[in-house]
Structure formats: structure tokens, C-alpha cells
């Protein structure tokens, strides 16, 4: 069975195609993505109207490329992200998916974007046992308890203010480094000293919420450090600031993720979201999981950011388990919860 997935929740227009065999195994046939990231760069963040227009312009070319890569004229099913995400962006992708499904005469499946990140993190793993997922991106920082791919997940904790990826973007802008901040800071951090500056780690005390995150204090601390240096006429090491900031973020993320695994008795930790491509996060997560006897499952780098493969993969897994097709009338939901069915 060939399943095509469309992703358009933010600034990437993604179409992925997977092949599902009778045993439930998946093979990636196509991964086509167009990003409007550079159009948002001068604004320092994603502009919803620009993102929606970019999806409209990119959808047909990206679809054609995905079908070319897959070597198929049409799939056996079409799936699309219906939430959470930007309202206009979601409408473009979901509407396109419904139109293609109707034109091809194949079933349509509505997919939860966050569930897609979990599914792709386990794409090359074996059957998923009880697990914890750490989803980290520009819009989300969450710890989720996962019993099976595609089923409703339980939120253990989330950010109380800025998402981790959002903190990266704000610190990058503060340092005049550009957008998006994640890859830029990660690259510079490799040349810096992560112990040069003692930036704070939010909500790490035992009395704090065990599974929640806070990065606003860290962001403010970086701003004050830079302002003080400028006021005193000191030249700062941007590399050291980046390394120390990144170490603080990754320290908190990995510490709390491993603690969540211990608290719920999970033996597998899944990483997902754009920040899961961060080199230090992957490295520190592996170190701490190894020490704790926890298996770490991380997607390929190209599947960490938003893509259509993760949507196709989640839909395919649920189809294999007997999921019914979605009504064509199903709407989009910008605030869709992870605690709802992941395909509906």
C-alpha cells in the first residue's frame, strides 16, 4: 500500500510517500520539502500570512516532485496534518490533501502533527514499548508518555513560557546572528567553551514542576550578560555565549527527559522536532540514556524538521492497525492537543 502525506503546519511544505507492506513495515519512497524560511528571516520569525502564501505556491511543485521520486502516478491513501499549527497554513495543506484524495478516488486521513514527530522518531525502530517522547521545536517543548504510535499520548510536562527553539531564535537575534537561530548557534557553539558562562537552568529544583520547562529566565540572563559587557566596553566571545547557552538548554532537556522515563518506568526515549537535529542535544541525550539504561531513538537529521514523511508514516501505521478513513468534512485545529487520537 502506498500512502502519501502532506505537512503544512508552519513554514515547510512537505510531501512524503511511504510503502506499507503486509507486516506493517514501512519504506520511504519520497521526501519532498520546500521551505519559506528565507522569506521570514528578515522578520526574525515566521509570519503566518507569508507562510500561507508560500504553501499555495509550493504545493503543486512539491507534490509533483514527491510523485516523481516515488515513481507512482497516485497513492492508495492521502494523509495531511490538520493541527496543531498556523491556521492558514494548515488550511492550505488539508484542503490540498482532500482535493487530491477526491480526484484520485482514495481515502483521506487527518493526522495530528505532533504524533507525526513521534512516529518518525520510531520509524526505523522495532515495535515501540512504553516510551517517553521529548518533542522540541520552535513552537513546542513537551514531554509525552507514549504507549503506542498513533494512540493518544499523555502530556507529562511542557514549557511554561518560551519553547526551546523559540529561545534559540531570540538569543540568535540578540547576538545579531540571524534566523533561524538553532543551526547558527549549534555551529558556533562547537568552537566555544560551554563552561565559560554559568547561565541558569530553569525549574531544576526538586520542588519545581518535575516535567515542565522554562527558558525565559535563561534568555533574560543571556541578554543581561551581553548588555553588561557592552556597558563595560568588553568584547564578548560569541562562541562562548552560544556554547554556554546551548549547554544550559540541552542540560535541562536531557535531565528532565531521563527523569520522566524513570518516573513512568519507560525504557525508550524518543526525540522529535526540529531541535532534535541539534548536535549537542543528541550527544548529551545519548550519554545520559546510556548511563540510565534507556534506549534512545532519534530520527534521521532530514526527518527532524517538519516533513511529509512523518505524516505518511503515522497514517500508514494506523491504517495497518485498522484505522477508518477520516470524513472529508473534518476541519483543521490550530490548537489540537496531543492527548487526542493521532489519526481521526
UniProtKB/Swiss-Prot annotation:
Q: What is its EC number?
A: 2.3.1.234
Sequence positions that bind substrate: 135-139, 169, 182, 186, 278
Is Transferase tagged as a keyword?
Answer: yes
Q: Name one GO cellular component term.
A: cytoplasm
Report keywords, A-Z: Acyltransferase, Cytoplasm, Iron, Metal-binding, Transferase, tRNA processing
The cofactor remark states: Binds 1 Fe(2+) ion per subunit.
Q: Which InterPro entries match?
A: ATPase_NBD (IPR043129), Gcp-like_dom (IPR000905), KAE1/TsaD (IPR017861), Peptidase_M22_CS (IPR017860), TsaD (IPR022450)
- Name the source's superkingdom: Bacteria
Under catalytic activity, the entry for this protein gives: L-threonylcarbamoyladenylate + adenosine(37) in tRNA = N(6)-L-threonylcarbamoyladenosine(37) in tRNA + AMP + H(+)
**Required cofactors, per record?**
Fe(2+)
Question: Transferase among the record's keywords?
Answer: yes
Q: Where is the composition biased (Polar residues)?
A: 326-344
Question: Which Gene Ontology BP annotations are present?
Answer: tRNA threonylcarbamoyladenosine modification
Localization terms from the record? Cytoplasm
The protein's GO terms of the molecular function aspect are: iron ion binding; N(6)-L-threonylcarbamoyladenine synthase activity
The annotated region (Disordered) lies at: 325-344
Record-listed Fe cation binding positions: 113, 117, 306
**Function recorded in the entry:** Required for the formation of a threonylcarbamoyl group on adenosine at position 37 (t(6)A37) in tRNAs that read codons beginning with adenine. Is involved in the transfer of the threonylcarbamoyl moiety of threonylcarbamoyl-AMP (TC-AMP) to the N6 group of A37, together with TsaE and TsaB. TsaD likely plays a direct catalytic role in this reaction.
Family according to the record: Belongs to the KAE1 / TsaD family.
Q: Please give the name of this protein.
A: tRNA N6-adenosine threonylcarbamoyltransferase
Species annotation: Corynebacterium glutamicum (strain R)
Q: Which gene encodes it?
A: tsaD
Amino acid at each position: 500500500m502506498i500512502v502519501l502525506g502532506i505537512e503544512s503546519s508552519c513554514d515547510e511544505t512537505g510531501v512524503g510517500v511511504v510503502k506499507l507492506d503486509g507486516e506493517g513495515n514501512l519504506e520511504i519512497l519520497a521526501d519532498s520539502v520546500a521551505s519559506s524560511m528565507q522569506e521570514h528571516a528578515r522578520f526574525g520569525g515566521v509570519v503566518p500570512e507569508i507562510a500561507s502564501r508560500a504553501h499555495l505556491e509550493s504545493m503543486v511543485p512539491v507534490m509533483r516532485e514527491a510523485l516523481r521520486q516515488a515513481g507512482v502516478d497516485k497513492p492508495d491513501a492521502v494523509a495531511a496534518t490538520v493541527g496543531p499549527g498556523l491556521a492558514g497554513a494548515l488550511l492550505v495543506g488539508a484542503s490540498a490533501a482532500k482535493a487530491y484524495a477526491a480526484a484520485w478516488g482514495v481515502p483521506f486521513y487527518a493526522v495530528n502533527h505532533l504524533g507525526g514527530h513521534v512516529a518518525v522518531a520510531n520509524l526505523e525502530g522495532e515495535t515501540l514499548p512504553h516510551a517517553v517522547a521529548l518533542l522540541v521545536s520552535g513552537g513546542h517543548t513537551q514531554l509525552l508518555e507514549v504507549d503506542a504510535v498513533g494512540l493518544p499520548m499523555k502530556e507529562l510536562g511542557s514549557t511554561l513560557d518560551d519553547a526551546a527553539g523559540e529561545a534559540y531564535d531570540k538569543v540568535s537575534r540578540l547576538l545579531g546572528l540571524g534566523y533561524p537561530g538553532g543551526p547558527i548557534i549549534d555551529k558556533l557553539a562547537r568552537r566555544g567553551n560551554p563552561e565559560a558562562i554559568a547561565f541558569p537552568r530553569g525549574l531544576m529544583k526538586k520542588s519545581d514542576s518535575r516535567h515542565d520547562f522554562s527558558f525565559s529566565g535563561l534568555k533574560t540572563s543571556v541578554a543581561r550578560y551581553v548588555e553588561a559587557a557592552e556597558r563595560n566596553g568588553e568584547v564578548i566571545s560569541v562562541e562562548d555565549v552560544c556554547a554556554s547557552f546551548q549547554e544550559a538548554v540541552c542540560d535541562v532537556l536531557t535531565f528532565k527527559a531521563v527523569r520522566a522515563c524513570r518516573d513512568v518506568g519507560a525504557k525508550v526515549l524518543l526525540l522529535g522536532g526540529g531541535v532534535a537535529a541539534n548536535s549537542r542535544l543528541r550527544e548529551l541525550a545519548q550519554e545520559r540514556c546510556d548511563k540510565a539504561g534507556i534506549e534512545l531513538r532519534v530520527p534521521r537529521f532530514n526527518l527532524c524538521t517538519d516533513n511529509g514523511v512523518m505524516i505518511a508514516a503515522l497514517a500508514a501505521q494506523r491504517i495497518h492497525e485498522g484505522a477508518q478513513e477520516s470524513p472529508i468534512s473534518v476541519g483543521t485545529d490550530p490548537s489540537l492537543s496531543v492527548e487526542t487520537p493521532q489519526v481521526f
